[in-house]
UniProtKB/Swiss-Prot annotation:
Record-linked PANTHER family: WUSCHEL-RELATED HOMEOBOX 13 (PTHR46777:SF5)
GO terms (BP aspect): callus formation; fruit dehiscence; fruit replum development; regulation of DNA-templated transcription
Descriptive protein name: WUSCHEL-related homeobox 13
Signal peptide range: none
């Protein structure tokens, strides 16, 4: 009996060792596999990484909110669309649409430059003038350009002998985009329209204005007899609002408005 007990004890001890191997990731006598995906240390490292990533995401969200709030505040001060410094030049063009009155100092400088007889300054010269005048008040490049256009047209009207004696060099002018467009129509060379008679008259006040009569198709295209069958397409030019388009069309006498009419199937 004693010998039998001694034989059972080694067997039991061996069996317990196998169970320990099974639990710790080994293979038991039954052939089952027990595998751990990661150790406790690896699991703890992964948990810390996830926590760090979560903190980073929260900080990124806070930074985005802060930057958005700053941009909104800057946009409110700068006019919304022009908060970007790259858009500052467009901002000058937009402010040119507003009514502008030169200060006495600005007007004196403008008159002095105009009296030098250089005509309408170049783009770079206008930029330099604007920079100089900005020291004496608010002004944009478009304001300077419009002022020289209007001043030149007014000087031409005076040369025609119909100018009012009350209009002196010190009078104040208000520049608008509509005024600039009107002046462009007045100074438009009528000879470019291809009209032999000029179609200009004097209203008795010294102001030479262009008539609202639409140019005749046969006068506009007299150099292209081959397109006489397509002259009916020029009826759209009878609208007075499109007269400024006619001036652009007549800039080059050799330009044929109907070079590609047949390509688009409009020749009828």
């Amino acid at each position: 009996m004693m010998e039998w007990d001694n034989q059972l004890q080694p067997n039991n001890h061996h069996s317990s060792n196998l169970q320990g191997i099974d639990v710790n990731g080994g293979s038991g006598a039954g052939g089952g596999m027990y595998v751990k995906v990661m150790t406790d240390e690896q699991y703890e490292t992964l948990r810390k990484q996830i926590a760090i990533y979560g903190t980073i995401c929260e900080r990124l969200v806070e930074m985005h909110k802060t930057l958005t709030a700053q941009q909104d505040l800057a946009g409110g001060r700068m006019g919304g669309l022009y908060a970007d410094p790259m858009m500052s030049s467009l901002g000058h063009k937009m402010t040119a649409r507003q009514r502008w009155t030169p200060t006495p100092v600005q007007l004196q400088i403008l008159e002095r430059i105009f009296d030098q007889g250089t005509g309408t300054p170049s783009k770079q010269k206008i930029k330099d003038i604007t920079e100089e005048l900005s020291q004496h008040g608010q002004i944009a490049e478009q304001n300077v350009y419009n002022w020289f256009q209007n001043r030149r047209a007014r000087s031409k009207r005076k040369q025609h002998g119909g100018g009012s004696s009350g209009n002196n060099n010190g009078e104040s002018e208000v520049e608008t985009e509509v005024e600039a467009l009107n002046e462009k129509r007045v100074v438009r060379p009528e000879s470019l329209l291809g009209l032999p008679d000029g179609n200009s008259n004097n209203n008795g006040l010294g102001t030479t204005t262009a008539t609202t009569t639409a140019p005749r198709p046969e006068d506009l295209c007299f150099q292209s007899p081959e397109i006489s069958s397509d002259l009916h397409l020029l009826d759209v030019l009878s609208n007075p609002r499109d007269e400024h388009l006619v001036g652009k069309m007549g800039l080059a006498e050799s330009y044929n408005l109907y070079d590609h009419v047949e390509d688009y199937g409009m020749s009828g």
